[in-house]
């Protein structure tokens, strides 16, 4: 009888043992979607992704989003459904498998695009991950990154010149690298691009609008420097509908 009671006790203990006695593999897939555009992937250097335990700060996984920007017609359609899957097999993502013992609050931080650090942005979010649940299928965990890429191509930094009038050339694009142009989902008239001229001491001189060159994402304008000295030129881009913006800076010295 004692033996039977002990056996019954063992059975009950087994039945009452917590389900998560051992850590459970929990697949996670993270994609970063540029505001009003496509996924940020290999063509822009990817996004740095870090997953941390929110309570302890301990890193759990890190890496970069790799892959393509995705299917334009699928992502940019105005009629997509509530649960539409935007990712294709090639769409950029970072994948990891976390071993979770219990429901865990994590902080997911993304930074980039890594190939355009002058325009990079950082976004972080917290969420509860449950052991054994699949966070990798469909759209996975999708994070939206605001901003615009601005890259001043001319004048190069620290240019010394005798010419009072110089040409400004800038590349302006979405954070995924998607081009601005008349034959793209990102028409030129949607954006305001201008150059702001400052003296080296910080005094604002004036702003000059940049005009679309006819080549995808390239904007240009001449600007006149009135007196000798060092100047800063900050080229900015703004989307008044989404409120996305970006900037890049260069310097010029008029002899």
What do the PLM-derived regions correspond to, one by one?
Residues 31-40, 171-186:
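Short amphipathic, basic-aromatic surface patches that mediate peripheral association
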Residues 41-48, 183-193:
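Short coil-to-beta strand junction motifs in C2/discoidin
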Residues 70-94, 213-220:
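Aromatic sugar-binding surface patches on proteins
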Residues 100-102, 224-229:
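Surface-exposed, short loops/turns at beta-strand junctions within beta-sandwich domains
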Residues 101-103, 110-121, 238-247:
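Short acidic/polar inter-strand loop motif in beta-rich domains
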Residues 114-139, 254-255:
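Structured interaction patches on ligand/partner-binding surfaces of diverse proteins
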Residues 129-178:
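Short, compositionally biased P/S/T/A/G/V-rich stretches that sit at domain boundaries
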């Amino acid at each position: 009888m004692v033996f039977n009671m002990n056996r019954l006790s063992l059975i009950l203990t087994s039945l009452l043992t917590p389900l998560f006695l051992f850590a459970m593999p929990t697949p996670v897939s993270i994609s970063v979607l540029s505001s009003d555009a496509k996924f940020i992937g290999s063509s822009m250097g990817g996004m740095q992704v870090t997953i941390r335990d929110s309570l302890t700060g301990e890193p759990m996984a890190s890496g970069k989003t790799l892959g393509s920007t995705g299917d334009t017609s699928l992502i940019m359609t105005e009629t997509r459904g509530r649960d539409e899957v935007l990712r294709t097999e090639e769409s950029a993502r970072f994948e990891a498998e976390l071993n979770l013992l219990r429901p865990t609050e994590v902080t997911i931080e993304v930074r980039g695009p890594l190939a355009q650090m002058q325009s990079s942005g950082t976004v972080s979010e917290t969420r509860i991950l449950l052991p054994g649940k699949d966070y990798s299928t469909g759209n996975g965990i999708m994070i939206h990154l605001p901003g615009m890429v601005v890259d001043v191509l001319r004048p190069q930094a620290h240019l010394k010149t005798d010419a009072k009038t110089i040409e400004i050339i800038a590349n302006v694009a979405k954070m995924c690298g998607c081009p601005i142009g008349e034959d793209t989902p990102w028409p030129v008239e949607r954006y305001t691009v201008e150059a702001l001229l400052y003296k080296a001491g910080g005094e604002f001189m004036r702003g000059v609008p940049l005009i679309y060159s006819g080549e995808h994402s390239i904007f240009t304008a001449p600007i006149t420097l009135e007196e000798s000295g060092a100047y800063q030129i900050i080229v900015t881009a703004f989307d008044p509908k989404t409120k996305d913006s970006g900037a890049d800076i260069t310097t010029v010295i008029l002899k």
